[in-house]
């Protein structure tokens, strides 16, 4: 089976057993996007500090806001989360789903002027195998080859119908880099990609600037933006991403015109801004799964009974009300409602609000008042408020809870270590939006965020997780997902708290901006 064009629909995402071309001839013949005007300097306010720009090694959304405008991937996702060809011109998939042969688009150049070849794709995948945060998606790979300059062949150890779903994930995407940069250590990747914008400067805690790449070649198979792919153009001269972590200051800058757009508008400001004719609001309903997860390598959260007691004590209505000013939905699942894999398996352990049960579990655990550190930050008020409310709920059942408040990059970095914290607060966005195995990958080997001893997650969970990826039918994969989710709840590998929307805003003279799971500045222009 060969696909030569546009969207791909996978069994995991759409319930079929094959990858199917979703584009139509009429779409191919439709008029392509053209910048209504070219020029100007776009300034966009981000809600958090950007911790780093090495997209292979960090799941931080703040990083994706910048890097996904600089880099491309072999395959990405469209707005419906179907795999979408990007730097791949076509893909041929063997009937047994073991050999994936990609033809690379010709004439694409890196920002350093070098022409893209299959050698660069191979080098990018090899670096990701070595340092990539989600490198487990490539564990199934047996070999990779480049028979010629425009062909990249991946041979798997076993049949994997969901391989395209895995490599198209943009949570920590396999961005394509020049082969000469493939040996760069983690967190030291030079910012040279093939995207419509190229890197200019990164001033820590202040801003990141990118500019139009004049030799960028748009993907003419498409007519406009499609997720992180499609037909992309840099209409503005430069984009400055300013790190405006205080919500009030960011909103004020938007109102005065100091910035053209804001990544996040707090609930308290939305009604006022909705009445401002100079500002346009956009809302993504299912954006953020508010979540906290434990460190299971350090006491007392290395004790399952302590973790279960903490889970039993939590009142999600109280936590989510404080986190979101009322803009939330409870969600006993690791999927958004309406997704193909949505299940409430294990949901009986969600939002228990059972202090008596919590005290009983604590008594059985042998807990002796050890400190439980809740690692959070103030840049994301929802995370700080969740930790604050949860700490009071834990104290009410006799747990010695204490907030550990750092700035976002420092908190994120500490959460990757095995010591110094017990629960970390974050939000999973693209992880959940993409659905399927990707929604649970953070709990599986080797990228298990809950820091199990020897970097080995719960064996039963891992068994069910593996079955999601290897199942030959959607029903098989759904059943495996339900079993994995139930086990995650039972072992308290992570605690989902609720679903929150995302409201973004731009000035009325900004054209072409569309909200997504990261800030996309392609096809965006500014009216004088």
Residue ranges, per PLM feature:
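Surface-exposed binding/hinge segments that line
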Residues: 28-29, 34-37, 136-180, 185-203
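Extracytoplasmic/peripheral linker and loop segments enriched in polar/acidic and small residues
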Residues: 33-35, 305, 351, 397-411, ...
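N-terminal lobe/hinge region of extracytoplasmic solute-binding protein
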Residues: 43-95, 126, 192
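A structural "hinge/loop" feature
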Residues: 48-64, 87-89, 114, 136, ...
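Aromatic-rich, solvent-exposed beta-strand/loop patch
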Residues: 96, 111, 155-173, 192-249, ...
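Structural transition elements
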Residues: 197, 329-364, 380-383
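Ligand/substrate-recognition segments at binding pockets and active sites
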Residues: 246-247, 359, 363-430, 446, ...
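Periplasmic-binding protein-like
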Residues: 272, 297, 301-339, 385-386, ...
């Amino acid at each position: 089976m060969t696909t030569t064009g546009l969207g791909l629909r996978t069994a995991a995402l759409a319930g079929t057993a094959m990858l199917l071309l979703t584009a139509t001839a009429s779409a191919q013949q439709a008029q392509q996007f053209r910048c209504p005007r070219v020029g100007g300097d776009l300034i966009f306010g981000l809600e958090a500090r950007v911790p780093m720009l090495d997209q292979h090694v960090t799941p931080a959304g703040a990083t994706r806001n910048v890097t996904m405008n600089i880099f491309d991937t072999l395959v990405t996702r469209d707005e419906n989360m179907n795999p979408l060809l990007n730097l791949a011109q076509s893909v041929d998939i063997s009937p047994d789903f073991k050999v994936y042969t990609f033809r690379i688009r010709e004439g694409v150049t890196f920002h350093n002027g070098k022409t893209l070849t299959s050698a660069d794709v191979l080098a990018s995948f090899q670096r990701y195998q070595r340092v990539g945060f989600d490198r487990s998606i490539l564990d199934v790979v047996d070999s990779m080859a480049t028979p010629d300059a425009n062909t990249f062949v991946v041979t798997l150890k076993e049949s994997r119908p969901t391989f395209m779903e895995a490599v198209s994930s943009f949570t920590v995407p396999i961005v394509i880099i020049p082969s000469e940069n493939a040996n760069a250590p983690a967190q030291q990747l030079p910012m040279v990609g093939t995207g419509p914008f190229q890197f200019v400067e990164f001033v820590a805690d202040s801003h990141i600037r990118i500019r139009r790449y004049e030799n960028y070649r748009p993907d003419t198979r498409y007519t406009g933006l499609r997720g992180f792919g499609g037909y992309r153009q840099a209409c503005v001269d430069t984009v400055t991403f300013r790190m405006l972590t205080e919500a009030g200051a960011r909103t004020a800058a938007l109102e005065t015109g100091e910035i053209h757009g804001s990544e996040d508008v707090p609930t308290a400001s939305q009604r006022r801004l909705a009445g401002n004719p100079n500002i346009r609001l956009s809302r993504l309903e299912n954006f953020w799964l508010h979540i906290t997860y434990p460190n299971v390598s350090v006491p007392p959260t290395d004790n399952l009974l302590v973790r279960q007691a903490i889970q039993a004590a939590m009142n999600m209505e109280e936590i989510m009300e404080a986190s979101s000013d009322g803009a939330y939905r409870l969600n006993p699942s690791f999927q958004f409602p309406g997704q193909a894999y949505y299940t409430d398996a294990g949901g009986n352990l969600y939002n228990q609000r059972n202090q008596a049960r919590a005290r009983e579990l604590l008594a059985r655990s042998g807990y002796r008042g050890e400190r439980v550190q809740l690692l959070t930050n103030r840049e994301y008020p929802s995370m700080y408020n969740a930790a604050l409310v949860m700490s009071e709920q834990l104290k009410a059942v006799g747990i010695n809870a204490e907030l550990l408040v750092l700035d976002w990059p420092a908190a994120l970095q500490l959460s990757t270590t095995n010591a110094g914290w017990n629960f970390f607060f974050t939000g999973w966005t693209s992880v959940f939006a993409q659905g399927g195995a990707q929604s649970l990958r953070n709990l599986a080997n080797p990228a298990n965020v809950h820091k199990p001893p020897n970097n080995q997650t719960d064996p039963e969970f891992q068994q069910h997780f593996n079955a999601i990826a290897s199942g030959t039918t959607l029903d098989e994969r759904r059943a495996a997902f339900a079993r994995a989710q139930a086990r995650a709840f039972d072992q308290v590998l992570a605690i989902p708290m609720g679903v929150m929307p995302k409201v973004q805003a731009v000035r009325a003279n900004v054209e072409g901006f569309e909200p997504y799971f990261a800030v996309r500045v392609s096809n965006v222009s500014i009216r004088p």
